[in-house]
């Protein structure tokens, strides 16, 4: 059976919500944003929640001060998507899962890293925890790293 693959934007019934865990790495944040922006979806039907978890959050810190969050937001807004940013203190995996529940996310988008051959067996601890503790689809993106 021949199947035709189309790159026409998929029309969604209502909003499609992504929760994106953004760490401190700019290239990974941009890779995550590019991956979402390049999906064949109607941009005006996509909502993206960018989440950065502060370790030991300091008083007065805001998520908008985090450069990877700003870069991802700019790229997604250029693509015409609705973007929100949230910051939380504490455990990143737990924050991602809680925000996904709060917003009834359709999909989670996390950053992956290149690893040694032994390290490739396991994802990073945050990514692994999220994958194991959610029933939502999880997309793991990686930046081109040298």
List PLM regions with ranges.
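Charged, low-complexity cytosolic intrinsically disordered regulatory segments
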Residues: 6-9, 53-108, 119, 146
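Short, conserved glycine- and acidic-residue-centered signature motifs
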Residues: 29, 65, 123-127
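Small/aliphatic-rich secondary-structure junction motif
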Residues: 8-60
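Gly/Ser-rich helix-loop-strand patches that form or flank binding pockets
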Residues: 1-5, 107-146
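Hydrophobic anchor at the start of a short beta-strand
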Residues: 46-48, 83-85, 138
């Amino acid at each position: 059976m021949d199947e035709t693959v189309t790159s026409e934007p998929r029309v969604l019934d209502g909003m499609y919500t992504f929760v994106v865990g953004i760490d401190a790495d700019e290239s990974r944040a941009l890779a995550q944003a590019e991956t979402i922006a390049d999906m064949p979806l109607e941009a005006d039907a996509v909502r993206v929640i960018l989440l950065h978890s502060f370790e030991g959050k300091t008083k007065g810190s805001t998520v908008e001060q985090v450069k990877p969050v700003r870069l991802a937001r700019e790229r997604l807004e250029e693509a015409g998507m609705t973007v929100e940013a949230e910051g939380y203190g504490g455990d990143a995996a737990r924050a991602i899962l809680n925000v996904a529940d709060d917003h009834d996310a359709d999909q989670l988008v996390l950053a992956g890293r290149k690893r040694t051959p032994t390290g490739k067996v396991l994802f990073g601890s945050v990514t692994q925890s999220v994958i194991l503790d959610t029933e939502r689809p999880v997309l793991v993106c990686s930046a081109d790293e040298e």
